[in-house]
UniProtKB/Swiss-Prot annotation:
Catalysed reactions listed for this entry: N(2)-formyl-N(1)-(5-phospho-beta-D-ribosyl)glycinamide + L-glutamine + ATP + H2O = 2-formamido-N(1)-(5-O-phospho-beta-D-ribosyl)acetamidine + L-glutamate + ADP + phosphate + H(+)
Organism: Pyrobaculum arsenaticum (strain DSM 13514 / JCM 11321 / PZ6)
Binding-site residues, ATP: 37, 76, 472, 509
Keyword Cytoplasm: yes
Annotated residues for binding of Mg(2+) 2: 102, 250
Entry protein name: Phosphoribosylformylglycinamidine synthase subunit PurL
Superkingdom classification of source: Archaea
Keywords (A to Z) from UniProt: ATP-binding, Cytoplasm, Ligase, Magnesium, Metal-binding, Nucleotide-binding, Purine biosynthesis
Gene3D superfamilies found in the cross-reference section: PurM-like C-terminal domain (3.90.650.10), PurM-like, N-terminal domain (3.30.1330.10)
Gene that specifies this protein: purL
Length: 697
């Protein structure tokens, strides 16, 4: 992507001369929207990121959250939307590889991956091609590097037919003493390790900073190529290298241009790099290409001269190619050489920060919810339960090796969130879940973002975790569209409100702009991943009940069907406002589940598809039916369709001999029966539900 005229003027003023070709390459990469956040960082600074347990927040490759004395968890989210649109297999695989390397920068061992995937309808050939290859790319890479894919969220909507949203989150664990210490000083060396530089991924950050069009398949060269074997070597290398090195940085988006500029800025020093010294797979590359190359499976290590031999011995042990390409100096400049000649010399202050861009904003009102007739309930239940957005996602998660590493205590499909055992501290575990709802975010971006936050928070709580931290990913169209930029700003405000009200800091995130195809932007997609702590993973709750259990509903059901799956599937409408948020009620769910945790068989939150979907999912997961009187649910309305399909927040279903909230039924038999008093509304065998709710991919 070309620099704007205004940006070129800033560069020329800062340098006092026109930039060289190599300097232009540096600015094109590092000042791209993908790397610089020039249109968004002024808003992202508003997000709360501090708490006593947050050791390191946003601003570096990976945060650190202390979950037990001396034990840190790190987690980070990344988008790979544009690459996955044109080469879904490599786009998704390299997205997973990149987020794993972010986690490695703090010396952590990656223990889990989550994916938030948004595709077009599966009956569309192109959308199906993207979906199947994205899933294959994630599966192949995660399985081969030995990091389990333990959960996530999948959504289907026409907006994502040509512009998928592919988000990967990696979770890692590290002891306090194994985090690289920092303390970088002049004379320290810069070592690049991993695959040799080549032209794959060249211009990838610029590619991710423009809209997709029909000719975007010509951008295949901007998509990096994954190499999970080298990725696995880097994982193993880092576990031993932390004793040799001062700092680790992922060599990803923006290539060496971004890595050098960020390292110099972070440590308040200058850097001098000999670009011709880097090991290359393609010897035809010139200095500008080497600087901008986004070849995958590479890390930058900062090491003292005394520590170099220690690092080199490990690199040779793991057969990882490497180059000593530069050093830190006092100059406060990024100085680039090629075969002994200076080809770039830029002040760090100029290279580090692209000028901020604040775009015009224009709000809009969502379509109002019209008066609609109440449909036949049994047909409505069938339509909602057969929706791909409600369906059981076994067709996706069965392709992932979610048991590798033997930490996964609650597996995909078993509960509202993934639960992982941390062998470093007995039965201590972490609970993690990601959520997004593009319909909500389109209708009301602020409320939609808050809904994503509370849904992920509630999923963690209902599984038995105490939420501790969150990361987010905001995915929208071009910021040059006033309505789109308004969507982004409103989403930030919704996240800020939720994080402050719930007391959960946002320790990292990702913004992806220009998610459009032709002239059509996607529905804004605001994903939130919440991580919590559970003191004993053996008491984690799955979305199950046993024969004879009472079925209980905690929370109040309102007539909140705006943006719901019911309105879309049954009435073909995307209208109204998303459900309201009661933060106090969400926090009470944490307390309630903690109080009942040891006495319940299982629990499940009520979300997309409403109470009907929650009950059906528990029946399918358990292999046991239930007889439920939905009219016993606390509510202030009389419409049965709204009672069954409302997506009101602050609710969960629990099962056990006793339970929280109101008893609405009893589990047992091989059929799920929904009724109102003595009137049967819906009845289906558990096997029939499995067939109805299966996702065909």
């Amino acid at each position: 992507m070309a620099l704007s005229r205004e940006e070129l003027e800033v560069i020329e003023r800062g340098l006092g001369r026109p930039p060289s070709e190599v300097e232009l390459a540096l600015f094109r990469s590092h000042w791209s929207e993908h790397c610089s956040y020039k249109s968004t960082r002024m808003w992202l600074r508003r997000l709360p990121s501090r708490a006593p347990w947050v050791v390191r927040g946003p601003g570096t490759d990976a945060p650190l959250v202390e979950i037990a004395e001396g034990l840190f968890v790190t987690f980070k989210i990344e988008s790979h939307n544009h690459p996955s649109a044109v080469d879904p297999y490599n786009g998704a695989a390299t997205g997973v590889g990149g987020i794993i390397r972010d986690i490695l920068t703090v010396g952590a061992r990656p223990v889990a991956l989550l994916v938030n995937l948004h595709f077009g309808p599966l009956d569309h050939p192109h959308a199906r091609w993207i979906a199947s290859n994205v899933v294959r790319g994630i599966s192949d890479y995660g399985n081969r590097v030995g990091v389990p894919v333990v959960g996530g969220e999948t959504w289907f909507d026409e907006d994502f037919t040509y512009t998928p949203i592919v988000l990967a989150t990696c979770v890692g664990v590290v002891e306090k003493g194994k985090v690289p210490p920092g303390g970088v000083e002049t004379g320290d060396l810069i070592v690049v390790a991993g695959l040799g530089a080549d032209k794959s991924g060249l211009g990838g950050s610029a590619f991710a900073s423009k809209t997709l069009r029909e000719e975007s398949e010509e951008d295949l060269g901007a998509v990096q190529v994954a190499d999970p074997l080298m990725g696995k070597k880097l994982i193993d290398l880092v576990q031993e290298a932390v004793g040799c090195v001062k700092f680790i940085k992922d060599l990803g988006g923006g290539g060496l241009a971004t890595a050098l500029a960020e390292l110099a800025e972070w440590f308040g020093l200058g850097v001098e790099a000999e670009l011709d010294k880097i090991h290359m797979s393609d010897r035809e590359m010139g200095p500008a290409e080497v600087l901008s190359s986004e070849t995958q499976e590479r890390l930058v290590f900062v090491v003292s001269p005394q520590g170099l031999e220690c690092l080199k011995s490990l690199l040779e042990k793991y057969e990882v190619p490497y180059s000593v390409v530069g050093r830190f100096v006092k100059s406060g400049r990024v100085r680039l050489l090629w075969r002994g000649e200076v080809v770039g010399d830029v002040p760090v202050w100029l290279a580090a920060k692209a000028p901020e861009m604040v775009w015009p904003r224009e709000s809009y009102e969502p379509p109002p919810l019209p008066e609609i007739p109440e449909p036949p309930i049994d047909k409505a239940v069938e339509l909602v339960l057969s929706s791909p957005n409600v369906a059981v996602k076994e067709a996706i998660y069965r392709r992932f090796d979610f048991d590798v590493g033997v930490r996964t205590a609650v597996k995909p499909g078993e509960g509202d969130a993934a639960v992982l055992k941390l062998y470093e501290r007995g039965n201590l575990g972490i609970v993690v879940k990601g959520d997004a709802n593009p319909r909500y975010a389109y209708l009301d971006p602020r409320l939609g973002a808050a809904n994503a936050f509370v849904k992920a928070y509630r999923n963690v709580a209902v599984a038995g975790g105490v939420p501790k931290a969150a990361v987010d990913s905001i995915n929208v169209g071009s910021p040059a569209r006033p309505a789109v930029y308004w969507q982004f700003v409103e989403a930030v405000e919704g996240l800020k409100e939720a994080a402050e009200a719930l007391g959960v800091p946002i320790v990292g995130g990702k913004v992806s702009l220009y998610n459009e195809y032709g002239d059509r932007p996607i529905k804004p997609t605001v994903a939130v991943v919440v991580l919590g702590v559970i003191d004993d993973v053996s008491t984690a709750l799955r979305a199950l009940w046993r024969d004879g259990d009472g079925v209980y509903l905690w929370g109040f059901t309102r007539g909140e069907v705006g943006g719901s799956e019911y309105m879309y599937r049954v009435h073909r409408l995307v209208a109204g406002r998303p459900p309201s948020v009661d933060y106090a009620a969400e926090k009470r769910i944490v307390e309630e589940v903690q109080r009942w945790r040891g006495r319940l068989t299982g629990a499940k939150d009520v979300g997309v598809g409403g109470l009907a979907a929650a009950l059906a999912k528990m029946a399918v997961a358990s292999g046991v039916g239930a007889d439920v009187d939905v009219c016993k649910a606390p509510t202030d309305m009389g419409r049965l369709d709204y009672l069954l399909f409302s997506e009101s927040n602050g609710r969960f279903v629990a099962a056990g001999e006793e339970g929280p909230g109101v008893k609405i039924g009893v589990a047992g038999g091989d059929r799920l029966v929904l009724r109102c008093g003595s009137t049967q509304l819906f009845s289906r065998s558990v096997d029939g539900l499995k067939e109805l709710m299966s996702l065909g991919l």
